[in-house]
């Protein structure tokens, strides 16, 4: 009803469409775009001009009074939500009806018709002209406005009269729409509607009411005819005819953009910089301007930007103009770097430069005196021409007589006065419209000089000449200082007079200064005025005061000049002037002399060094710097000659004009050695420049004929196949290309041979890179397929086919597509080395097999067949008759994870790859009657360490009875660094020693007996691939010459590959005579079960042991006496350092047994022989490495024997898989399995927003997460994390710069709920961060060292936390993130200001920020080589992201640092550390109990109690606890793993969780677990049942010993020195592929601070080499820790190294430099000698039984493990 009434009572809709809102006065000259844009000064002029053109009635000059125009009473309805008008209330629709304002109805009540057919639309015409003034909207009028009778004349300068508002003029054309919008916006502002007008970003101050919407809608229709609107406006109105605000918003945005472009150009053209602000600020300002112009599609080139910047440089920066004046390729970044360098130099100089006070006597009246200086400054004011033709300097007549010519200001050079011209029109844009006062630049060269003339300068106070030829009565300068316009010193060599002889014979003389460091000879008018001579610039003459003309002056350029012909020469040579100078105290040294004295250093380095007083007794002013910057030293040019730099992409400009296949690159690779004659040794490659199409051709040699044949073939192929002619071939200068034959070939065919310059291989990058790519592919394909090396070219050819078919990163098409060829048909390609069966069409017999196994190589060039290699025939065939073998591989891929290292995240595992032993390897013979410096090699393990008698130089057969057969043992293959070494399954272990079958065995039908004694350790925790003991496959392959019958029984043997060999003779158990070992067995062997009563090995005498020869070929001088204890004496002071002093206070085991050196009863040291334990709890894993005898089945377990406790029910089960129902199994492709592992996501311990809040059913937890969420939001806003002033549209931002964000929620260890707003850095584009920046945290060794020093020195330990640390670091890159979810702005973006958590660069930004603050504000210094360790004289700080640990003797020093930190950062004190009682800390996951002056205990009991049960490992909390993490005698079977793919990924995932946690704990403080962790980590990708069980056992042991702690006690206060010791150990060959395990433990003042267990990266051939490798790994870290300790604690330090290898100590001690056994061995040994002697390192021997590093290299029996660890962890 209301809407109908409104429509019925509004007959005069068109008559009141021009009413406006009246409010307080708005100035008529207010800019209509004041909300969003800057004021335009021409707006008011345009407004007045337009308004004056409107039709007016001449008879009136003001608006007639209208008594109806009275203000209504405020409406009784409530005001709108967004506020009222400033003076009046709003009307309801009913009141609007009563006052005839119904036409301002709600837009929703209007008829929804087209724009021009709307009932509110009114088109003015001549009969109904537009009103001159409009009553306000809030003014009630009883009668509607009569448009027909309102014809008042409008005053031109008024926009409002009384309560009326001047309406805008009517739009007259589409082109004037932007100008019309300005007036319309002003009209709305004057109507008090400015706060609802959107700015260029679409923002408004309040929402409009319905009446206001109708008002704007109607007025816009009235003054903007639809047919005159621009197209984009019509498109908006056609969608929504009432959407006027969108039109205004886009109009304002367009005007704002145009206005901003204008401002940016003006700002860029008027850049000025003198160093008053920082260079960074200047760079940011300029870059911002250029970026805004670029966003508006205006690209400013680097050259233009550099020119504009150079134009505005002044002061010390002005010299850059000359530097860049001749450069054509100017880079903006380089210029900014130069500016930054000068700014930094000036900043440092200003801090260090003392104030100078110089007094002048003779010329004191010439310069103005100031409190700080009395320097005479040359002023060069040159008058500028105005618009008239007369120069401004024409008033020079008055200079001599007028007081205007004063020297009061002559000591200051006028700066360039710049008056920027305002642009008169929006469309006018002229760069450089400036008026500058011209002046010469005196200290740089100029091209404007008029030769043989003096420049007349009315502003110069002194006359300066560059040549002493005209200087009379010259005297050396001693007190005058001259500066130029840039306030740079001008050195003055001499002072004298210039004598003039003018036209009429008039002679005069003026004073002048001689300096060669100016661009012009300057003639001062003030000096001439003193002689009553003036310059008349109207007549261009020099005149006397009486008008007599003395000489003409010449105008050249902008200046006036006087010829030097009027000067009288002095007849004094320049040498004379220099001699005068040298005779005085002001003697300047020539720069070439100083250049030679200072080692031919460059100019800038010398000058900067003198400025900073780096060289004493020589000042910068003492040197003659003239022409120093351009001085060319011949010796430097010769000695420092370098190659020219290759600019990336520079080659392209020379080759753009070539078409496909016209420009080729070629190169030859080879030779490849050790190949059959039939295999090629070289290949030659060709690459087309345009298409990057590649060809390769095999070569057997590099003769001219071979190369010529290839070129003939390639040219013919290109000509016929691509209809192209080769024009240029680029190649290097090898003799195969530069010979006469090939040169003649090119000449006859008109081909240009383009050679590289001498020794410039980088210019041949295309061909070189192709060869590198092909060879990388070749090595990969051969290694993956396992094919022999002589097929290397087939791999290269296969790679070429594939590379031609793939799109390279720099091209959008493949080479084949560029060449116009079809894409590669994938159905015609097989994997390189794919096993196939080839049909034999011509068998030898009809009953012979028709199929031959082979391996696919590559598609044939000459047919539609495939090239296939047939190993049995040793040839390749081209055929299509083949069948692919499914699920077969050319070889078993082997992956061998090497060293387990720990990064800061403690989750990554790294591995090194190892090569495998091929069948065609060479075999190396070893004599079984000899021994090496290690124990004899057994079936699996080669004994780790020698103890005694391993240095004997005698070689006597210990048995004297029978000669034992010589065994052939395969030596490890030399590792090829280019072949991938990743292996999952360790392959068959090397050849094993023979075994003897004992028929009395109770378990397997016979006991396996070795022909050697038991090694020092009976077994190892390693991997093998072998059958169960007792089977014939356990026997190794012996060559025919080994099969000698010595009364041995026949035993059937088998090769490793499975081929049966004839029976060979072995020793029977009735006539065995074994030799004895030459080393004392280890602890676990000596303490073997004493119940064994049937030994089968006869023990020889000690003499035989001592005289046993060794395989080790160390020269005799490397061996020492058995009873000697060698040590290294680094210097003379070492006499005070003994082995006892090094060993003192170390947590070594207490031994009651005899020393290993006590050999009085050798038989007591020989261990009893164990029987085999095949019924182990891990499923009967065999121990084929030990010697066995029959033993009682029932006997009690003791601590020294193997013990496996059950921690999971499945561990007790036997291998019952055969009883399970059959299930579907799938053989895993191991390569694919690795890819699958990479896709496995880590365990997620956090919650997403929907999980924590949206769908969280736990209301209590949900409320806590909501509270944490709002706390995080408030913190982000408080830190100004993003720009809150503007939201960006997603479509307007480059997607690379958009970073996804998310909230993560978790519950901290202390029970608090945490919310964190993070960026998805894992999907961050590489272009948005600098990959060179690194995020540093304190190294764990540094933290442990600091804690140890704190205990010994009674330090207070304070723990701090900085809230939202990353948010304090600014971000340099332009990045955007999505707003938080509560804002509901899904399509908007926020620009980041701070380093948000999760960004790649956030950690590095925070590190640089806090580092700078600690150094500059806290007076800290970072310890060199140890990031995040800071110290000063009182406090040491360890920084781990936002956690800080403070150490200090004085607690007040810590508090002082805390106070300083709180000034900048929100710093929380977690634990102040005051008090003398026990204090508990939680530092980076370590639970620390600290009582000053007494002890420190480090553990993780609470954390492990919480985390271990969550690993889904069935722990056995009530059962018997395990007493060791693993036991010797258990091997990881390496049978082929058959498992479902999903189950495989699940188990790998489980292994990652378990080993990841174990790694974290071991790295922190459980160093005794590192060996087991490292070994299991190597099998993460081989999650067999056995590996999982061993991992469960490790986790169970961690659970049982979770309360163990690393115990430290305070060092004895009587010891003045710090003692840093490394204990080293190695276990030779106990890892797959002959690898050795090495380990080190580091101790500071008797406290274990770190440990390392890793597999040796190189293959060692003896125990000595393994020990040397272990020692060489320990020394670098030992030296680094030594530096850290000395920085943190100034006490002297003693460095010691302990090893149980006497041979290693002997080699280090020896001075013999004869050739070593191999290169690696010798290099390591020589390096150790240098490091030990050069670092004051003491090396001593430690008994093996006391070597606690043993736990790092091998599994130990329980008793031994406890003995070695109970002193330092319990």
From Swiss-Prot:
Residue ranges, annotated region (Disordered): 1-88, 355-453, 915-935, 1005-1038, 1057-1205
Residues annotated as binding Mg(2+) 3: 1625, 1667, 1700
Gene Ontology biological process terms, A to Z: DNA integration; DNA recombination; proteolysis; transposition; viral translational frameshifting
Biased composition (Low complexity): 369-382
GO molecular function: aspartic-type endopeptidase activity; ATP binding; DNA binding; DNA-directed DNA polymerase activity; RNA binding; RNA-directed DNA polymerase activity; RNA-DNA hybrid ribonuclease activity; zinc ion binding
Domain Reverse transcriptase Ty1/copia-type span(s) in chain numbering: 1353-1491
Domain Integrase catalytic: 656-831
SUPFAM superfamilies: DNA/RNA polymerases (SSF56672), Ribonuclease H-like (SSF53098)
InterPro entries, per database record: DNA/RNA_pol_sf, Integrase_cat-core, PolX-like_BBD, Retrotran_Ty1/copia-like, RNaseH-like_sf, RNaseH_sf, RVT_2, TYA
Subcellular locations according to the entry: Cytoplasm; Nucleus
Domain RNase H Ty1/copia-type: 1625-1767
Domains (record comment): The C-terminal RNA-binding region of CA is sufficient for all its nucleocapsid-like chaperone activities.
The protein's name: Transposon Ty2-DR1 Gag-Pol polyprotein
UniProt organism field: Saccharomyces cerevisiae (strain ATCC 204508 / S288c)
